[in-house]
């Protein structure tokens, strides 16, 4: 969210560094409720006493539950294949071939036959909507499970409002939902199956976000989740990841909540009718049984929540959390594994295209201004969070945006404000019970309120979300120590060092009585999602930068003239001028001088930016305090990098040695 000067505010609460040293950028505190009823009471605010509070009569949907899904499908063979595919998805260990899947409702057909209804001619049987509910018959033939296929947003609205308590339409047309007791990700409950392949490929041990589980435990949880889903009406969505058509991933999401289905409809790339017809077997499947807990006495489980990833089976199982962001970030982790195997670099970054067609990547943690700076109306937005860099250029992984909503204001972030309309999912927001107007300043449920909407809702979005090879790689840091320059040009080794470090600084909340800035490091600016060792991603980044002529930059959006509490935050207009100078190529021909300790090259002048702020030492009145804070920050960088210092690619440590030499020098 923006502060008065327009930059994203610094987070002060609700985030903790985990025991293994990994900083989880968007995990959040538990919901502020003790019971489900209390949670629902927090969602809706009572209207003011002067506002009449009348209950409008409810009009039932005509035609019953199945009426929206009664149109045609012509290819009988293709439909049969789809039914077989659904059956395979819902197979479990005790039902290896999956439940029998038939068209229509066998119970309804039986009733019609008993009443002497004439049979329907075959020609008419084929006229059905592609989203018609398939009925999966359990082995015992005593239960029926509706499988709703690729519903539209309007149909998902109907399902959510009718069957999911806590689902409402807001005054702007968005769907307000509740994610239950979990209002943020649960990184400590994420597990990855460790087998012969992943034991060698993935990053394990200190600092890694990957917590192991075995195949047997995964199958136990998968069985539990699939059996639960088989007892319900489930929604199946088929979506795509990666706008690069040569490197797309086909994803199937099976969930029990329309909210989850609409969320993924917005966040993934929405296939055309032709792409759906030729969809075939998915590359990855998510089983979201988040309403049902895992057995916490199962091996490797530490709570009733578990997010399990099996890369060999290409499946993810979610239990015990209804927070939709687990699906988004789970798939991002999958892309962090699959794409590098194809020689494609996956990145946790924003990306835009300048007015002259040049592309820039923006890396940064919360509060650095990544969204603010990458969403520039002088250019086009390729994406705000997840990207791939291949030999074809850069491409957005997703088809939507997942924006924070706390303290959202129209005048500060009009693009996000205007995107909250019909089709958008609003998570855990509070609204007026009568008018349905959302109060974005109210965090009664959680501070981690979010909006998920298609990227087409942003006016400056570039569709398709692809671009040429980036010319600039911009690493953003909000330095609350006030010792990093507003902009520095980096050599390749420095780019790798600062990319692996993933530095920013947080300011402790005043309620704690602590005024000291707190350094935060998140490897590759997304430690919670990476699968391989950070040095592998850094090496791929350097290789592509060298191959395609990209330049690395370190941009400080934090403090100048003193640390937090003494100096002032660098003004947003100055930072925008710096970004403009990077886009235009002005800084490539500027004169540079080198700083102490970090050895950063800083320009002596930039058009529209006061020269006296370019070298931080000249903005401090207390030079001794500057030196003290500079050495302190350098020491924090050194300490953080110790966990990466011994890494070798094969038996060769030369790359790591080169990267280490680019760090602070005392």
From Swiss-Prot:
<keyword id="KW-0067">ATP-binding</keyword>
<dbReference type="GO" id="GO:0005524">
    <property type="term" value="F:ATP binding"/>
</dbReference>
<dbReference type="GO" id="GO:0005829">
    <property type="term" value="C:cytosol"/>
</dbReference>
<protein>
    <recommendedName>
        <fullName>Phosphoenolpyruvate carboxykinase (ATP)</fullName>
        <ecNumber>4.1.1.49</ecNumber>
    </recommendedName>
</protein>
<dbReference type="InterPro" id="IPR015994">
    <property type="entry name" value="PEPCK_ATP_CS"/>
</dbReference>
<keyword id="KW-0210">Decarboxylase</keyword>
<feature type="binding site">
    <location>
        <begin position="364"/>
        <end position="371"/>
    </location>
    <ligand>
        <name>ATP</name>
    </ligand>
</feature>
<dbReference type="InterPro" id="IPR001272">
    <property type="entry name" value="PEP_carboxykinase_ATP"/>
</dbReference>
<keyword id="KW-0456">Lyase</keyword>
<dbReference type="InterPro" id="IPR008210">
    <property type="entry name" value="PEP_carboxykinase_N"/>
</dbReference>
<dbReference type="InterPro" id="IPR013035">
    <property type="entry name" value="PEP_carboxykinase_C"/>
</dbReference>
<dbReference type="GO" id="GO:0004612">
    <property type="term" value="F:phosphoenolpyruvate carboxykinase (ATP) activity"/>
</dbReference>
<keyword id="KW-0312">Gluconeogenesis</keyword>
<comment type="similarity">
    <text>Belongs to the phosphoenolpyruvate carboxykinase (ATP) family.</text>
</comment>
<keyword id="KW-0963">Cytoplasm</keyword>
<feature type="compositionally biased region" description="Polar residues">
    <location>
        <begin position="48"/>
        <end position="58"/>
    </location>
</feature>
<feature type="region of interest" description="Disordered">
    <location>
        <begin position="1"/>
        <end position="68"/>
    </location>
</feature>
<dbReference type="GO" id="GO:0006094">
    <property type="term" value="P:gluconeogenesis"/>
</dbReference>
<keyword id="KW-0547">Nucleotide-binding</keyword>
<dbReference type="Pfam" id="PF01293">
    <property type="entry name" value="PEPCK_ATP"/>
</dbReference>
<feature type="region of interest" description="Disordered">
    <location>
        <begin position="91"/>
        <end position="132"/>
    </location>
</feature>
<feature type="compositionally biased region" description="Low complexity">
    <location>
        <begin position="109"/>
        <end position="123"/>
    </location>
</feature>
<comment type="pathway">
    <text>Carbohydrate biosynthesis; gluconeogenesis.</text>
</comment>
């Amino acid at each position: 969210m923006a502060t008065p000067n327009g930059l994203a505010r610094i987070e002060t609460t609700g985030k903790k560094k985990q025991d293994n040293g990994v900083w989880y950028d968007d995990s959040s505190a538990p919901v502020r409720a003790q019971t489900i009823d209390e949670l629902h009471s927090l969602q809706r605010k009572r209207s003011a006493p002067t506002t009449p509070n009348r209950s409008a009569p409810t009009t039932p949907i005509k035609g019953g539950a199945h009426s929206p899904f009664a149109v045609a499908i012509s290819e009988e063979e293709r439909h049969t294949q789809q039914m077989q595919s659904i059956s395979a998805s819902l197979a479990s260990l005790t039902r290896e071939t999956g439940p029998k899947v038939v068209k229509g409702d066998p119970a309804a057909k039986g009733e019609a036959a008993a009443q002497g209804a004439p049979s329907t001619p075959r020609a008419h049987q084929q006229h059905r909507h592609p989203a018609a509910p398939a009925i999966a018959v359990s082995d015992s033939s005593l239960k029926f499970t509706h499988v709703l296929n690729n519903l539209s947003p309007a149909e998902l609205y109907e399902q959510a409002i009718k069957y999911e308590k806590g689902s409402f339409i807001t005054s702007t047309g968005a769907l307000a939902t509740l994610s239950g007791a979990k209002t943020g990700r649960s990184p400590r409950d994420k597990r990855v199956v460790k087998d012969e392949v992943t034991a060698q490929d993935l990053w394990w041990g200190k600092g890694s976000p990957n917590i192991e589980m075995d195949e047997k435990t995964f199958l136990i949880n998968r069985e539990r989740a699939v059996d639960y889903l088989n007892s319900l009406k489930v929604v199946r969505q088929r979506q795509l990841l990666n706008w690069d058509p040569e490197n797309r991933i086909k994803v199937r999401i099976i969930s029990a909540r329309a909210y989850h289905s609409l969320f993924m409809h917005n966040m993934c790339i929405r296939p055309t009718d032709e792409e759906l017809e030729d969809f075939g077997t998915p590359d990855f499947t998510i089983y979201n049984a988040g309403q049902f807990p895992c057995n916490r006495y199962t091996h490797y489980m530490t709570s009733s929540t578990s997010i399990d990833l099996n890369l060999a089976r290409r499946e993810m199982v979610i239990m015990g959390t209804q927070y939709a962001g687990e699906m988004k970030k789970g798939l991002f982790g999958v892309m962090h594994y699959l794409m590098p195997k194809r020689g494609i670099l996956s990145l946790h970054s924003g990306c835009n295209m300048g007015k002259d067609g040049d592309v820039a990547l923006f890396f940064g943690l919360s509060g650095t201004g990544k969204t603010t700076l990458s969403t520039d109306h002088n250019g086009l937005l390729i994406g705000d969070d997840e990207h791939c860099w291949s030999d074809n250029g850069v491409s957005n992984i997703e088809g939507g945006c997942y924006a924070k909503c706390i303290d959202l204001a129209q005048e500060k972030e009009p693009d996000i404000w205007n995107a909250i309309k019909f089709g958008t999912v609003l998570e855990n927001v509070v609204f007026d019970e009568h008018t349905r107007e959302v109060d974005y300043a109210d965090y009664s449920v959680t501070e981690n309120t979010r909006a998920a909407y298609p990227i087409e809702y942003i006016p400056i979005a570039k569709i398709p979300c692809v671009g040429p090879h980036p010319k600039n790689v911009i690493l953003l840091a909000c330095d609350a120590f006030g010792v990093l320059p507003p902009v520095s040009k980096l050599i390749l080794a420095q780019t790798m060092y600062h990319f692996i470090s993933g530095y920013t600084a947080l300011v402790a909340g005043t309620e704690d009585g602590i005024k000291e800035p707190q350094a935060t490091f998140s490897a590759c600016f997304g430690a919670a999602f990476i699968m391989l060792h950070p040095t592998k991603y850094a090496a791929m980044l350097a290789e592509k930068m060298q191959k395609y002529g990209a330049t690395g930059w370190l941009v400080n959006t934090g403090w100048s003239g003193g640390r937090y509490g003494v100096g002032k935050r660098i003004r947003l207009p100055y930072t925008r001028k710096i970004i403009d100078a990077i886009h235009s190529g002005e800084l490539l021909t500027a004169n540079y001088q080198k700083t102490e300790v970090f050895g950063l090259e800083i320009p002596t002048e930039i058009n529209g930016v006061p020269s006296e702020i370019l070298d931080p030492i000249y903005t401090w009145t207390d030079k001794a305090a500057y030196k003290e804070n500079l050495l302190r920050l350098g020491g924090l960088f050194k300490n953080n990098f110790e966990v990466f210092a011994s890494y070798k690619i094969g038996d060769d440590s030369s790359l790591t040695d080169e990267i280490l030499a680019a760090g602070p020098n005392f």
